């Protein structure tokens, strides 16, 4: 288990990087965030959580929510029902690409790009009577924090700027790979992205990825095999088009969001969440990646 002093040192060492990235501005509600925030939290498989910096300040988790939605789908569907509609390969295109959807006849490359996450949201909408409420129940239970909520301002802001995601959904619908009402699914999807959580919440919530599918309270959420498979997908496709660089520098399965958060896991040991709102050119937290690289090096840990 790393000590708090180590996490504080990691935060201090990356602070000079502040100012080198750019806060996401295509969602107006995200553009107003203080770019100088830095936080890190670690939860070990014995249930202990420590943190440093702004690790208790909530932020918009954005695409990190795609891990929760895929996990929820895995508890509701046979795997063939999921993987017949979305692939398992890295994209190589931007996370909101229409071109790839067209070229591959409506089947998204993986569940962590927007097209793939929209298919997963469509699956959840088909199977659940109240998909937004069910997601909130899940993340509150996983993080053991019943104050986790949706940021309605962010969800509304995303909906008002949803033309591209709507285009992706309608394009997939034209290929027969989208069943529900596009507007309804989009509203659910944007609420998932607008979950507000802090680094401590997320490191606790993602512990099942490090603990063979078992949550903080010991409940089996998904199987050991499913957990291994999910971590494999995170290692290859969790960081948009920066997955290779992240694997090289950090060496952990991970998932980023344009809110500046990144979650990562060392299977069998710990889950970690970092947050710094300034992004690199790939849309991943610049200082966040550096914090994970520092932590990986200091602990001498990598999955490779």
Swiss-Prot record:
Cross-referenced Pfam families: Glutaminase
What one GO molecular function would you report for this record? glutaminase activity
Print the keywords alphabetically.
Hydrolase
| Any one Gene Ontology BP term | glutamate biosynthetic process
Does the UniProt entry include the keyword Hydrolase?
A: yes
Give the reaction(s) catalysed.
L-glutamine + H2O = L-glutamate + NH4(+)
Q: What class of enzyme is it?
A: hydrolase
What domain of life does the native source organism fall in? Bacteria
Binding-site residues, substrate:
63, 114, 158, 165, 189, 240, 258
- Does the keyword Transmembrane belong to this entry? no
- The record's EC number reads 3.5.1.2
The record's HAMAP family line, in alphabetical order, gives: Glutaminase
What is the protein's quaternary organization? Homotetramer.
Family (UniProt): Belongs to the glutaminase family.
Which protein are we looking at?
Glutaminase
The protein's organism comes out as Shewanella oneidensis (strain ATCC 700550 / JCM 31522 / CIP 106686 / LMG 19005 / NCIMB 14063 / MR-1)
* Species lineage: Bacteria, Pseudomonadati, Pseudomonadota, Gammaproteobacteria, Alteromonadales
